[in-house]
Amino acid sequence: MGTINSIIKGAEPIFIKGNEIGLLISHGFMGTPQSVRFIGEQLANLGYTILAPRLSGHGTDYYDLEKCHYDDWFASLENGYQKLKKYCTDIFIIGQSMGGTLSLWLAKKNPEIAGIMLINAALTIPSLEHLQNLSSPRYIDEDHPDIKDQSVYEITYKKAPIHAIHELQKLMDRTPAILKSIKCPILGIKSAIDHVVPPQNTDFILANIESKNKQLIVLENSYHVASMDFDKMTIVNSCHQFVQDLLHQKKQARIE
């Protein structure tokens, strides 16, 4: 899906070349790479190669988002994965909200992925359920991003196209059925209080995914957009530890 409008300043994709361990980071619905910039840069400082693509229709104008199907968002993430494969021997995925949902699909399609880290991954968004079968209004007003730290500004759209909401709902509705086919290690990160995606979404994913290596982190001082909130360094540290533990296990298995 092509973009006809220019990219909002600050919403550009992020690529930082580091070592042979790649971290592909996906923002969520209506968000941009800006929402994951902090965690990406912090992880890059630890040596990783970082790529945070801009999902199709995001970071430009909501008219662009209206033209997208969820396959377009997945294609944006998958293209990022293919790019990272040129530089990296091991690739891990970090996905926030809808980015977490897309990460599950990427892991299903690419079982060689070393592990996934999901931040408030979305399977249900109760506040949007009343729009499921409506064709109007064409756009709805978007609330302020769900961030506890009031000093934070997230780049997003002022309106959400109802067509894009329907595509998001389709993606979420179809995701539970694939969980049994995903076996890579998973770190589920959820905010204790999330006004957009119920924290139980993460519990459901961990309970139903086929992965043997499952871990859970609960953020006590952040809301939905946790990568920009008070616990953002907890996310960085938890993801770093998760990756390092898996790399150590892989190294030990080779020795044995």
Please tell me what each predicted stretch does.
Residues I39, C184, P198-A207:
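Short alpha-helix in the alpha/beta-hydrolase fold that links the catalytic acid
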Residues L43-D64:
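Conserved alpha/beta-hydrolase
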Residues D61-Y87, F92:
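Catalytic nucleophile-loop/oxyanion-hole region of alpha/beta-hydrolase
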Residues G95-G99, S103:
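Gly/Ala-rich beta-loop-alpha elbow adjacent to hydrolase catalytic centers
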Residues M117-S127:
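Active-site nucleophile loop of the alpha/beta-hydrolase fold
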Residues I182, G188-K190, D194:
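Short beta-strand/loop motif that positions the catalytic acidic residue
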Residues D203, A207-V225:
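Catalytic histidine neighborhood in serine/cysteine hydrolases
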Residues N221-E256:
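Catalytic active-site module of serine/aspartate enzymes centered on a nucleophile-bearing elbow/loop
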